[in-house]
């Protein structure tokens, strides 16, 4: 008895591929990320609020794969720069995107790629591998977010790691 390896991301196992479908999936993940950003808890010790965005980014990448997830996050950031109130607390604008949270937003794009690539190799069907992909994706987000937070706030990297990673 042989078993066939499962490859591809979750969404590809139940839906036929088409450009329209891909566009809807990208728009859906963009919307999911924007909604998750609205679940924001301001923290008194950092300008970066605690949100559900990281979960939306990682889950979306695992479900949709790297290409669609990266496009969704680029669209999300583009909408924010254009003035759509999609960031935490309904914030928007170029100054917000390049502000304290900018590194995390760029991290969303790179984490989407990493988690999406791992998931496209069948990881989205294995809990342990998916968990490891999520941890790796979170590391990517924080590895870009913390230094950017330190730079934009004029604080040390130690302060940024404590206040922008460890406490969140």
Predicted regions and their residues:
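Transmembrane alpha-helical segments of integral membrane proteins
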Residues: 143-158
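Juxtamembrane helix-boundary/capping and inter-helix hinge elements in multi-pass membrane proteins
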Residues: 66, 123-124, 154-159
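Individual transmembrane alpha-helices with interfacial aromatic-anchor signatures
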Residues: 101, 160-168
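Hydrophobic residues within alpha-helical transmembrane segments
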Residues: 28, 74-78, 110, 132, ...
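Short helix-perturbing small/polar motifs within transmembrane alpha-helices
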Residues: 1-15, 21, 35, 94-141, ...
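Hydrophobic transmembrane alpha-helices
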Residues: 2-70
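Aromatic-anchored segments of alpha-helical transmembrane domains
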Residues: 30-38, 77-86, 138-144
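Alpha-helical membrane segments and adjacent membrane-interface helices in multi-pass membrane proteins
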Residues: 39-114
């Amino acid at each position: 008895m042989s078993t066939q390896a499962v490859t591809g991301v979750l969404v590809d196992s139940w839906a036929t591929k088409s450009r329209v479908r891909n566009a809807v999936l990208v728009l859906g993940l963009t919307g999911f990320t924007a909604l998750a950003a609205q679940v924001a808890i301001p923290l008194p010790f950092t300008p970066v609020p605690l949100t559900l965005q990281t979960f939306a980014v990682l889950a979306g990448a695992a479900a949709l794969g790297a290409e669609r997830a990266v496009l969704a996050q680029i669209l999300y950031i583009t909408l924010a720069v254009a003035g759509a109130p999609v960031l935490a607390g309904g914030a928007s604008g170029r100054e917000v995107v390049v502000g304290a949270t900018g590194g995390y937003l760029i991290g969303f794009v790179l984490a989407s790629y990493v988690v999406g690539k791992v998931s496209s190799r069948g990881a989205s069907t294995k809990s342990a591998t998916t968990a490891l992909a999520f941890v790796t994706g979170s590391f990517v987000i924080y590895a870009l977010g913390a230094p950017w937070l330190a730079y934009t706030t004029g604080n040390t990297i130690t302060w940024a790691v404590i206040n922008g990673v460890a406490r969140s």
